[in-house]
Amino acid sequence: MSMLIRAGKKSFGVWMIAISLLLTLSACGTSGGTNGGAASGTAGGKDTTVPAAKPQEPAKEVPKELPTINVAYMPDIHGATPIVLGEEKGYFKEAGVKINAVKFLSGPPEFQAMAAGDIDIAYIGPGATFLSAQGKGNIIAVDSLNTGDMVYATKKSGIKDWKDLKGKTVGVPKGTSGEMILNLGIKKGGLKPEDVNAVNMDVAGAVSAFVAGKVDAVAIWSPYTSEIEKQVGKDNIVKLGDNKMFFPEYVFPQSWVVNPKFLKEKPELVEKFLAAWVKANDYRIKNIEETIKLTAKYTQVPEDSLKVQVDTTEWIESKKQVDYFKDGTVIKWYENLEKLFVENGKLTEVVKGDTFVSPAPFLKVVK
């Protein structure tokens, strides 16, 4: 009997120890298994409160990448400077766009790139305006008025006047403002287009051909005219004429055009581009010396050549351009140019300027 009692007591003691261990383990399990809050329990009569876990910091917001606009520029004071200043002064960043600038030397290839969807906005000279009139690009801003297109003849060619171009070979990038001046000169000299052997060349080819004496004359524009003068010497050149010879009947606006599809699908990006362009345009006019230096660095065109180009340009402040848009002046400029394109066969008829001139984005940006 006493043995049974002793056995029972021993058994009871073992059970008490086991229960005590289970309670301790249970308390520990509760402490370690709670997430995001304070967990407490007792083990051996002691408080085992666990500090609350620190709340997770919100994930840092990744900066959104700015939308990109593919812009065709030309390496001169007109076609490059707004892009240069827009980047240098942060105007494009302020407007909320990124620019992918693509270099071109004349307008027609730019329109081809727009048709292929590779270019959204482009700078063009007056000579490519007929492509806008054909519906291939909407004019959204007038960069400036150009007086820098010229027709040069070599002294050894014997050409002294427009009429002397008969039977001569002229290098000209067709579809450009240089060709427009050539055509006006041919008409002024009492000749017909077929009287002159006008050879289509790219800009570099036309300059090289003239310098090498492979053509009798060249129809080109600043700053390439300056390069010709440096290589050949002014004494070996006969200047037949430039834009000013045909003022005020004809004015030669240089333009910024937009791919019609891009304008339709992303008008807000066109407005953002113009918001930056307007600032760059007005800064260029007021700070021409700094502008020349920055543009020369970007384009690798000598400063002297850009200075010559400045002298053959009539600038238009952005607010003044608003007036020209509203009073119909801009429309008249382009419709008048169309008459030349009809004469030389680039267009079959003069179409209304408001079918390809789109001032709405500009007027929305400049109040």
What are these model-derived regions, one by one?
Residues 24-27:
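C-terminal motif of bacterial Sec signal peptides marking the signal peptidase cleavage site
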Residues 264-346:
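Secondary-structure end/capping motifs
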